[in-house]
Each structure stands twice: as structure tokens, then as C-alpha cells.
Amino acid sequence: MLRTHLAGSLRPEQAEQTVTLTGWVARRRDHGGVIFIDLRDASGVAQVVFRAGDVAEQAHRLRAEYCVRVTGTVEVRPEGNQNFEIPTGAIEVNATELEVLNESAPLPFQLDDQVGEEARLKYRYLDLRREGPGSAIRLRSKVSAAARGVLAHHEFVEVETPTLTRSTPEGARDFLVPSRLQPGSFYALPQSPQLFKQLLMVGGIERYYQIARCYRDEDFRADRQPEFTQLDIEMAFVNQDDIILLAEEILTALWKLVGHEIKTPIDRMTYTEAMRRYGSDKPDLRFDIELVECMDFFKDTTFRVFQAEYVGAVVMPGGASQPRKQLDAWQEWAKQRGAKGLAYVLVGEDGTLGGPVAKNLTDAEREGLAAHVGAQPGDCVFFAAGATKPMRALLGAARGEIARKKDLIDPDAWAFVWIVDAPMFEPTADATASGDVALGHSAWTAVHHAFTSPKPEFFDTFDTDPDSALAYAYDIVCNGNEIGGGSIRIHRKDIQERVFKVMGISEEEAQEQFGFLLDAFAFGAPPHGGIAFGWDRITALLAGMDSIREVIAFPKSGGGVDPLTDAPAPISAQQRKESGIDAKPEKKSEDKKSEGDTAEAK
């Protein structure tokens, strides 16, 4: 090794020891001919002093981010010169030897400055030298190790599934890879290991996991990446409770890394309850605001706006004092979400109601409204009326915005909840409107994916009454973020074929795209289920980062661009020709197929 110690490990107990350190010059200071540098390596920073002689002369040429090797003696700093903000602040190294391992060009930005994301990603290798980004990547490694420890204890098998596979629709567009040896044909990068892990269960592996790379060619969305990582788990001969128990054990181990003890069992909430109370299937439970349904309260109203399928309200504590400009801003906020606006009532300090809605209400409605929605004098009540699903979503978003504006969220709190009993199907129009790629050609598509089992009580009716069918699925939510989701899978061929039929996937199409899975189900496939955790999101939460880009070593920027390598990039004409991108695939004849089968048999 080029060094004897890590810079961040030095303490007063090592005084008088001779040490050799390696790292980068974080800062350089010259005090009357005595040179001080802060030497940084992966473990931290130590102060090195060059006092006299040739070594001090050498140190004069040091600049920021020079890579160096230093030998010297550990000394306790004089009283009054300690820096208690860093672990090594009580010592310094009195240098006797200096070797410049590599010089550094002038930096595009100072590593201790606030820098724009584009520059940080373009020079990501410099960005990673900074304490925050570097620590986040190291935490990610610890997170993976902790999960592996739990799974090894339960005798799970880590299996690598293919990353070059066939294109099978799973809810987003595939990234396609041309096959040079079969011009005109393409592999697809996997959106998830879903089908392969189910085949592993059929194969008797029984307990599988993988820290899997996944790829989805989606339109740009905030804080999404075209390639991402999930902890993928599958188990045979289990029910929902078994999966949830294991998942909670993993989460408990992860959150211990940041000093938090998760209380288990984690509460469960049905999808219906979550939407009714919070307007979201991933509610942030760190604050107590809930939606209030007002259909019964306004059942005889003469106010036409409230003569709707759904009328709901959410209370903003102290919101009546908002200036008109802020109330108008709420209207623009709602319009950006596709609504016409956000109706409101202001509750005066004397309990009287004000605002444009109040004058349209009857005396009885005005008298009872505050009590019905739980509003106090000085509060503002926001309303949404119309179709149930979008209006609940609007109020759910308003709930979160209220909490942020009123500073109601404890940044140090952790609130977990399982969301269970979600619908199995949703109208295809709803899925496409939200930006998802709907699988199938009918009016219905799967909410989770096509391989999720219905709850047992819906086995006989899910295809005749898809609107009522519930999925045997479960999502885990932390602080308003969905950090994992899974389900009990379909393991019977007949049920899988019925699900495909509901989604408008013909027998021919099902056989072409999923025939290998349907064939496997015919050979004694066991009951099985699993879960996948969003590894980027979990690590970002544990690291206290707002964006998953902060915990990915080399992330993409908006639109899937990599500023570091300038990917994606055009390919050459020769590459295009060799890859066969423009070739039309040869139609496989039955004769050729038969010949291949015969040769294989020989």
C-alpha cells in the first residue's frame, strides 16, 4: 500500500507515530512561510503542516486537488488551534516527505462551492470527491450489504437474470438492442426481472433475490431515471403476510443504519381508505390533515358547482389570513393540475364565512359547514367537486402543499404504511392519461401488472366484473414515497389467460409474447409472490437527499442525457450497417423450424 493510515482515522492517541497518507489537496494555506494543507481521502480530512526545509519548498507548488503522498509525524495541535468540527481536529501531521503523485488542471468549479447540476454531472468524478455525494454512494453500499445480510440469513439465493431478453410489454416502452447475428431482430433491456423470477419459482429455486438493473424508455418525469435499480425478491409457497414480514425485517435493518428503529408491524391501510382520507395511494402520514367528504352535507344544495358526484374539502389551518394574491395563486396551482380552480371558504375569527363560495350557500349550510369539515376560526377551507378520482387527487395534492406552506412536516420523522387491496384493473383511458403505457387492447388494463393475482374471493368474478376486482397486492409507503411494491402472482395458466382476455390480449398474442411463461405454468408452478424495493429512492431517503440522482454514481439528467459522456450519441454508418437496424427480419418458415428441432434432437 502507498499509505499506512487513512487521513480520517488519525486521533491524539497516535501522537508521535510516523504515518504515510495519500489523497487530494482540499485546501492550501500559507502562514509566514509555513504551509498548511487539508489532505482529503475517502475517510475524511487531516491537516498537514510543512514547516521548513526542502519539504516546505516542495509544498509551495501544491494546488487544489493535486494528488499527493505525505509522510510525517502525528502531533497534537496546540491548545486554541483545534478544530472540533472535524474528527481529526485535535491533531496535525508534521510532514517530512512529500511526493506529488499527479497534478491537477485548474478546476471547472471549486469543490466547496454551490454548483449547478449540469456542471456537477459533467464533472461527476470531481463532484464525487465532495463529502455529500461521496458519502451518499458509500451509504448505498452499506444499504445493499444490510439487505444482503437479512436475505442470506433466510437462505435466499442471489440470481442474475438476463439483461438481453425479448420485448414483453410491462407498462412502459422498452429500450431495444439490435441483434447483429439476426438482422432486423432486437433484444430488449428488461423493465424488471418479473417474468424470469417467476420462472425461477417454477424451477424450484423458492427464495430468490437480486439487486437488479431495470430500464424504461419513459417520457421525461421529474426525478425519474431511464435506468434504475431495485431490490427484487420472490418466494414460493407464501402468502401476503409472509412477504410483508420479510419486507419489514429488511426495512428495519436499513433504517438502523441511520439510527432509526421502525416500529413493527407497520400499519396497513386499504387503497380505498387511503384515497378517501388522503387523496393519494402513497399518503404522507407525518401530518394529520385529512380530506372530508361533503356529498351528504350538500345533498340538497342549490349551488350548482356542488351538485356533483364528489364534493370534498381540505382545511388549511390559519389560511384565512392569506392575501388575495396568494388565494389567486392557488387557482393557478389547481389549473396546472388540470382543474378549473380550487373553491374556498374563509372562516373569520368570529366564525362567519367569507369568500366567493360562501355567498352561494344557504344559511343552514353556512352555519354547519365549519363544524362538518373541522375548521376553526382563522382557517381556510378548500373544496373540489366533480368526478371522484381526479377531485380526490387534487385535494390530496393540496393537502401536501398546505403542509409545506404551513411547515407542518417534521423533517426528522419517519412514517410508514402498507397500502393493500388496490383495484386489479383500471380504465385504459386513466392509465394513458397518467403517462403509462397500457398493456392490451380493451377498455381495462392492469393497475400493477398483468401477472398480479386477484384476491381469492375474486377468482370467479374478476373477468365478468373487472371494476370490482381487488388485486392481491401491497405497496409500502414512507413519508409519501412509494418505496416498494409487490403482489402474490398468478401461478395457474387458466387464470393468467383470463386476465389477458380482460385486457384485450388475444390467445395468439399471449402465446407470442408470453408463451414461455404460460408453458411453464403447465408444469406444476407453485404459488408464489414477491416484492421489489426502489433502491435509488430508499437510499435517497436514508441519505436525506431530495433527488435520486444524488445517490446514483453516474446519473442521467433530464431527458435521459448523460452530460459526462454525452450519451446518447449518433452511431457511425458502419455501426448502423453491422447492427442490422434497417434490415427486415426473415420470416421463420415451419420447415426451417422443423429442421432446427431435428438438429437439436440429434
Swiss-Prot record:
Major localisation: cytoplasm
Keyword Flavoprotein: no
The enzyme's E.C. designation: 6.1.1.23
Region (Aspartate) location: 194-197
Region (Disordered) residue spans: 559-602
Transmembrane residue ranges: none
Subunit-structure text: Homodimer.
Record-given protein name: Aspartate--tRNA(Asp/Asn) ligase
Organism: Rhodococcus erythropolis (strain PR4 / NBRC 100887)
